A protein has these predicted regions:
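Long amphipathic alpha-helical segments
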Residues: 2-3, 8-104
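Short, glycine-rich nucleotide/cofactor-binding loops
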Residues: 14, 26-29, 134-140, 212-217
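Glycine/charged-rich beta-loop-alpha catalytic/anionic-binding loops adjacent to active sites
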Residues: 17-26, 64, 103-108, 156-160, ...
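Gly/Ser/Thr-rich loops at beta-strand to alpha-helix junctions
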Residues: 32-33, 134-144, 167-168
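Ligand-binding beta-strand-loop-alpha-helix segment within the catalytic cores
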Residues: 87-131, 144, 149, 159-203
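Histidine-anchored nucleotide/phosphate-binding helix
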Residues: 141-153, 226
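Conserved phosphate- and dinucleotide-binding cores of soluble alpha/beta proteins
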Residues: 157, 163-302
Length: 302
């Protein structure tokens, strides 16, 4: 497993690891699930080429690097949860090469939690789909994609309508991914959201961060979509692994919320042609939450 320092493949050097995490920190299109899985994959590759001499600094670099990624992408609650898990499992290790194996086990376990969680979420979502359902979504959530694929596989899904999701236009990407998997999908302009809701049996959006009181931070456009669904009495579900849930409520005081949102926007991820890519959803606008534990009216902590 280990190599001499002179024999490291280029993709496992400290500079390459830092470069890969920097690229993830600047990624403005991928969802938190994709970012988290890619970060853990890079960490695993980096740690798998350790020596007795460098295992400790490498483990420290992984902990610090993923913490920094979570800070720079601080709209992503899942990355906060993953960073906390990495620090909890790896901090203090690295005194012997045996810690390389333990660190790898911890990283792989976190990856498995993410992958198995999405699989469990997809299976538990099936009762929410009426027969031959028309589903409505927006942006490009890997969780929503997995749920839709499973619903299609189990013959619960007829087709999907995806809002374009400007300013980033991630909805177009999701349509391509759905069609690649054989799912009938149509991209509609955001301005036609009302018409889209009129055709839908249910709506699904992926959360970026969920607070324990049920407040959600998600892509801009979700709030008017939720209002339209409420008006048309179309169920509106928010998907989010329990690792996305922050263990405290978000203040309802307007200035405190503005400050919280400004903290997200300050990293650059929240800026687009309209100056904002994220917005809050209040709990009373949602039919409920979908996690690896199934459907619930309130979010559950990991």
């Amino acid at each position: 497993m280990s190599k001499s320092s002179a024999g490291f493949p280029p993709q496992t050097t400290p500079s390459h690891f830092e470069k890969r995490l920097r690229a993830l920190s600047k990624d403005r299109r991928s969802g938190s699930g994709t970012l988290a899985r890619n970060a853990l994959r890079e960490a695993e590759r980096f740690l798998a080429n350790s020596t007795e001499e460098n295992i400790r600094p490498r483990i420290e670099q992984v902990v610090e690097g993923i913490e920094r990624l979570a800070h720079e992408q601080r709209a992503m609650g899942l990355l906060q949860g993953v960073a906390e898990g990495v620090k909890r499992e790896l901090a203090g290790r690295g005194r012997t090469l045996a810690d390389e194996g333990r660190a790898l086990v911890a990283i792989r376990s976190l990856r498995a939690v993410l992958e198995q969680g999405v699989g469990s979420m997809s299976a538990r979502a099936l009762p929410l789909f009426p027969a031959k359902a028309v589903a409505l979504t927006m942006s490009d959530s890997s969780e929503v994609l997995a749920v839709l694929r499973e619903a299609r596989r189990r013959r619960r899904l007829a087709r999907v309508i995806v809002l374009e999701s400007l300013p980033g236009g991630e909805g177009r990407t999701l349509v391509r991914r759905l069609r690649t998997g054989g799912i009938s999908a149509t991209c509609m302009p955001d301005a036609l959201a009302s018409a889209a809701v009129g055709q839908a049996d249910l709506a699904l959006v992926g959360a970026d961060t969920i607070w324990s009181d049920g407040t959600v931070l998600t892509k801009v456009g979700a709030h008017p979509l939720a209002l339209l669904c409420a008006y048309r009495k179309v169920p509106f579900y928010v998907t989010g692994l329990s690792l996305k849930v922050r263990p405290h409520p978000l203040s309802r005081e307007p200035r405190a919320r503005r400050k919280a949102l400004d903290g997200v926007l300050a990293d650059g991820r929240g800026t687009g042609s309209d100056g904002k890519l994220f917005e809050f959803l209040e709990p009373d606008l949602m039919t409920g939450f979908l996690s690896e534990r199934g459907f619930s009216k309130k979010p559950s902590l990991a």
